[in-house]
Amino acid sequence: MSKFQLEQMLRAGVHFGHLARRWSPKMKPYIFMEKNGVHIIDLKKTLVMADEALKAIEAIASTGREIMLVGTKKQAKVIIAEQAERAGMPYVCERWLGGMLTNFSTIRQSIRRMNAIDRMETDGTFDMITKKERLMLLREKDKLVRILGGIANMNRLPAALFVVDIKKEHIAIKEARSLGIPIFAMVDTNCDPDEVDYIIPANDDAIRSIELMVKAVADTIIEARSLQEEQEAIAEMDEQVEEDAEEASND
């Protein structure tokens, strides 16, 4: 069953594209019409393609792998952070650091530095250094947390990316493509859909449109993870029953 309804998408403004003069011709198959100089997205196609994307996201999440949520534009950053944290997924909602994927080992060093400063605050180290040194370390930590806090617990490359605004996040898109990491994205009428593996034709500027899509992604991940945990618990119980039965037969 679909997580979306056409009326719900209309209320969220998912159908509003960009000015027709700013369009990408490759988005023509997903455009319903032009109205007052603005392209209107075909929501029937959005509905189908969003459902296909969510099924693929569910398949990834059900294996325990991570999906990184990316959206650094003003309208998206709070939504990305809230929904990613709710789903327990890594995210980037501030600046995308070049090499965040392609040079992940170096990024991990910065994360370790961030965690080291965090430990200094609690293990007594701060009591043994000057006020100026403490201030410098706290400023360094704040900067690292702002940029890397969303991936602090990410120990390996994500299995996929979900992106809001592929034009703005072009560096993230380029890095993911170079590594063969699947890309799910909201793709507006001014974007190149060829850069994305799972296209969701949608308004990537309106807050309600972004929230609708990102929340659906988070809900899908949470449901898939919950089902995975249930299946693992059942498997453990079955294994324990078999072990108990084997012990009983040997007595």
UniProtKB/Swiss-Prot annotation:
Belongs to the universal ribosomal protein uS2 family. InterPro entries: Ribosomal_uS2 (IPR001865), Ribosomal_uS2_bac/mit/plastid (IPR005706), Ribosomal_uS2_CS (IPR018130), Ribosomal_uS2_flav_dom_sf (IPR023591). Residues 232-251 are annotated as: Disordered. It holds the Pfam family Ribosomal_S2. It comes from Chlorobaculum parvum (strain DSM 263 / NCIMB 8327). PANTHER family: 30S RIBOSOMAL PROTEIN S2 PROKARYOTIC AND ORGANELLAR, SMALL RIBOSOMAL SUBUNIT PROTEIN US2M. This is Small ribosomal subunit protein uS2. GO terms for biological process: translation. Gene3D superfamilies: Glucose-6-phosphate isomerase like protein, domain 1 (3.40.50.10490), Helix hairpin bin (1.10.287.610). It comes from the Bacteria.
